[in-house]
C-alpha cells in the first residue's frame, strides 16, 4: 500500500508538472535532445534529467541508510542522524573558502573525506558503549550540531564567498545536462556490485557478532568496507545535488514498517522507496515555485515534508523498544553552597563587562557609560538566556524521564524559532504588527505545539524515538530558513543574524525585563518542584499519590514553552545549554530536583556569559554569536562526556 501510494502520488505530481511545462506531444519528451529546438531541449533536460537525478539520488540515500542500520543494528541510523551528510558538506565549504585549488579534482574526494571523518567520529564516540542505540544517535546529534555551528561561523565571516555554495548545498535537483545522471547511475551500479558479496556477511552479523565470528565472518573488515561504501555514495550524492536530508531515513523507516527481513530485499525496497520519496518531493517543489515566486530547493522540502513523515513512522514503530541509558553524569548528593555560585556568576558578569579588548589591546574598561550602554546589556541578556535554557532542560529531562531531553534536542527551541519566523512573515499580511508581543505569542505557539506533540508521543513510543522528533523539527526549521535565505527579502537579514544566537541587539531598556522574566520563571519552576518530582516516577504513581496529572503537565509544558520562547527570542535557537548544564549540575552534587534547578540556572547563566565574552573578543574586531560559541563549547564538552557513558550505561 505504501509503495503503491508513493507511485500514484509521484505519477500524479509528475503529470501535473508535465501539463504545465511540456507543450509538445508527449512522445517527443524522450526524443534525442538534438532533434528538439533550444527551448524544448532545455525543458526536456529540466524535466527528465531532474527526475532521473531525483530517482537515483533518493534511491542511493535509501540504500545508505539501510546499510547503516544493518551495520549498527539501530533503526534510527541514517546519513542524516549519524552526521555523514553534514561532514561532507562542511568539508566542501572549507575547501571552497580556503583551498579552492583542490576543487579541480572534483567535489567527490573532498566530500568523501568529510563524510568518512564525521562518521568515524560518531562511531569512535559510541564504540565504548558497544554502539548503544541512544548513545550512537546522541553522538550523531552532537556531531551534527557541532559541525553546523562551525559551518555557521564560516558563513558569517565569509558570507559573500559562501553564498553560492550555500545555495547549491540547499539541495537543488534542477539539471541542465545529463552529467549528474550518468555519475549517479555509475555509482548505483558500482554500489550494487559492491553490496552483492556483502549480503551474506551482513545477514550473519545482524544476529550476533560472536556467532558471526564463529562462522568465519571478518566483522571488522566488513564494517570498514560498509563504512567506505556509505561514505563514497553519500559524498557523491552531496557533491552532485547538495545535502538532502530525511530521504534515506524515511525510506529505511518505511522498509522497517513493512517488516522486510532479507537484507537483499531491504536494500532493493529502500532504493525504490527512496527514489519515489525524492521524486515526489522534487515534483512538489517544482509545482510550488510559480505559486511562491521563488526557487525551492528539494533539500529544503525534504526537511519540511520529512518531519510529518517521521512522526507517522514513529507511531508505526510504537511497539519497538530501544534500550535507554542512565543519566550521563551521576553525582553524589552534596551540600551546594549557592551563594558562592551566585557570587561567581556576578564576578563573571563583571569581568565580561570590564576586561575587554579594543584597538589598544587588552585592558580594564573605565568607561562606565560605554559599559552600561553596550556590554552590560549583552552580558545580562546572555545570563538570562542561559538561565532559562538550563531550567527548561532540567524540567524536560525530569518530565520525560529522558537524560537527553532539552529544548534544543527535542526541537522545542526550533519550534519557537519557527513560530517567530512565520509570525514575522505572516502577521504583516494579516494586517498585524510584527512587534515583540505578537512575536512572543507566535514563538509560544510554536514551542507549545512541539511540547504537546512530544508528550503525546512519549506515552506511545520508546523515549529513544523522541530524538527523531527533535531532528525532524530542526530539519523543518532548516528547510524554512533555506527558503528564507533564497527569498532575498532584505527584512530577513536581521532574523538570520538573530538565528545564529547573537546578543548584539540587547538594549538597556529591555534587558532588565528579560532578566525579570527569567527570575520569575525560575521561581515558578521551584514552586512546581514537588508535583514534578512525583510525575518523574510515572503518571500512574502520580495519580495514586493524588497529583492532578493533566493540569500539572500542561502547566509544566506552558512553563517550558515560556522558558524556551523567551530565550529563543533573546539570542536564537542555537546552543547546548539546555542539554549540557543539567548533567553538569548533577555531577557537582545537585541531585535533588530543587537544588539541580538552582545550580543549573547559575551554571547556565555563567556559561552563556562566558560564551558571549569569547564570541566578542576571540576574533576581535569581528564577533562570533554567543549561541554559536555555546554550541561549540557544549558540543566539545559532550564529545568528551559521551566517553563516560559506558560506565553509567553498563552499571
Predicted regions and their residues:
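Alpha-helical transmembrane segments in inner-membrane proteins
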Residues: 1-651
Amino acid at each position: 500500500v505504501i509503495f503503491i501510494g508513493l507511485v500514484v502520488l509521484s505519477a500524479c505530481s509528475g503529470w501535473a508538472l508535465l501539463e504545465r511545462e511540456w507543450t509538445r506531444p508527449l512522445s517527443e519528451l524522450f526524443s534525442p535532445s538534438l532533434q528538439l529546438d533550444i527551448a524544448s531541449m532545455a525543458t526536456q533536460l529540466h524535466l527528465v534529467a531532474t527526475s532521473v537525478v531525483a530517482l537515483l539520488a533518493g534511491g542511493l540515500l535509501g540504500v545508505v541508510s539501510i546499510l547503516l542500520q544493518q551495520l549498527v543494528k539501530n533503526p534510527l541510523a541514517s546519513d542524516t542522524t549519524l552526521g555523514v551528510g553534514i561532514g561532507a558538506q562542511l568539508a566542501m565549504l572549507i575547501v571552497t573558502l580556503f583551498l579552492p585549488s583542490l576543487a579541480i579534482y572534483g567535489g567527490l574526494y573532498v566530500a568523501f573525506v568529510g563524510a568518512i571523518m564525521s562518521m568515524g567520529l560518531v562511531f569512535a564516540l559510541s564504540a565504548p558503549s558497544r554502539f548503544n542505540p541512544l548513545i550512537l544517535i546522541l553522538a550523531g546529534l552532537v556531531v551534527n550540531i557541532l559541525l553546523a555551528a562551525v559551518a555557521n561561523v564560516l558563513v558569517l565571516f565569509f558570507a559573500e564567498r559562501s553564498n553560492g555554495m550555500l545555495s547549491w548545498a540547499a539541495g537543488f535537483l534542477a539539471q541542465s545536462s545529463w552529467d549528474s545522471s550518468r555519475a549517479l547511475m555509475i555509482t548505483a551500479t558500482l554500489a550494487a556490485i559492491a553490496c552483492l558479496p556483502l549480503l551474506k556477511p551482513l545477514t550473519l552479523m545482524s544476529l550476533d557478532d560472536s556467532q558471526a565470528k564463529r562462522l568465519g565472518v571478518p566483522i571488522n573488515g566488513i564494517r570498514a568496507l560498509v563504512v567506505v561504501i556509505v561514505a563514497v555514495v553519500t559524498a557523491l550524492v552531496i557533491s552532485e545535488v547538495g545535502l538532502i536530508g530525511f530521504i534515506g531515513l524515511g525510506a529505511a523507516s518505511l522498509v522497517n514498517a513493512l517488516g522486510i527481513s532479507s537484507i537483499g530485499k531491504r536494500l532493493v525496497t529502500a532504493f525504490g522507496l527512496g527514489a519515489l520519496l525524492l521524486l515526489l518531493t522534487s515534483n512538489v517543489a517544482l509545482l510550488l515555485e510559480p505559486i511562491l515566486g521563488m526557487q525551492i530547493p528539494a533539500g529544503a522540502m525534504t526537511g519540511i515534508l520529512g518531519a510529518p513523515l517521521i512522526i507517522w513512522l514513529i507511531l508505526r514503530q510504537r511497539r519497538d523498544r530501544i534500550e535507554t541509558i542512565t543519566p550521563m553524569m551521576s553525582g553524589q548528593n552534596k551540600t551546594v553552597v549557592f551563594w558562592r555560585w551566585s557570587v561567581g556568576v556576578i564576578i563573571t558578569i563583571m569581568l565580561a563587562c570590564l576586561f575587554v579588548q579594543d584597538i589598544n589591546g587588552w585592558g580594564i574598561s573605565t568607561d562606565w557609560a560605554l559599559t552600561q550602554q553596550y556590554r552590560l546589556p549583552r552580558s545580562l541578556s546572555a545570563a538570562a538566556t542561559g538561565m532559562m535554557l538550563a531550567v527548561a532542560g532540567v524540567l524536560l529531562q525530569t518530565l520525560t524521564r529522558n537524560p537527553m531531553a532539552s529544548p534544543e534536542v527535542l526541537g522545542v527551541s526550533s519550534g519557537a524559532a519557527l513560530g517567530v519566523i512565520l509570525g514575522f512573515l505572516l502577521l504583516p499580511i494579516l494586517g498585524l504588527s510584527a512587534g515583540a508581543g505578537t512575536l512572543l505569542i507566535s514563538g509560544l505557539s510554536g514551542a507549545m505545539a512541539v511540547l504537546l506533540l512530544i508528550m503525546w508521543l512519549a506515552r506511545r513510543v520508546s523515549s529513544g524515538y523522541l530524538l527523531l522528533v527533535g531532528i525532524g523539527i530542526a530539519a523543518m526549521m532548516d528547510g524554512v530558513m533555506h527558503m528564507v535565505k533564497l527569498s532575498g527579502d532584505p527584512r530577513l537579514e536581521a532574523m538570520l543574524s538573530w538565528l545564529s544566537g547573537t546578543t548584539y541587539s540587547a538594549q538597556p531598556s529591555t534587558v532588565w525585563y528579560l532578566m525579570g522574566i527569567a527570575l520569575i520563571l525560575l521561581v515558578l519552576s521551584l514552586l512546581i518542584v514537588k508535583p514534578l518530582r512525583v510525575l518523574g516516577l510515572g503518571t500512574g504513581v502520580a495519580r495514586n499519590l493524588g497529583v492532578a496529572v493533566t493540569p500539572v503537565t500542561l502547566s509544566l509544558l506552558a512553563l517550558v514553552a515560556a522558558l524556551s520562547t523567551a530565550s529563543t527570542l533573546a539570542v536564537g535557537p542555537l546552543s547546548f545549554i539546555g542539554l549540557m548544564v543539567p548533567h553538569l549540575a548533577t555531577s557537582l552534587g545537585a541531585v535533588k530536583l530543587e537544588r539541580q534547578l538552582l545550580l543549573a540556572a547559575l551554571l547556565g547563566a555563567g556559561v552563556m556569559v562566558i560564551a558571549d565574552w569569547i564570541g566578542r573578543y576571540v576574533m576581535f574586531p569581528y564577533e562570533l554569536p554567543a549561541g554559536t560559541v555555546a554550541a561549540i563549547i557544549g558540543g566539545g564538552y559532550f564529545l568528551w562526556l559521551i566517553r563516560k557513558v559506558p560506565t553509567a550505561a553498563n552499571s
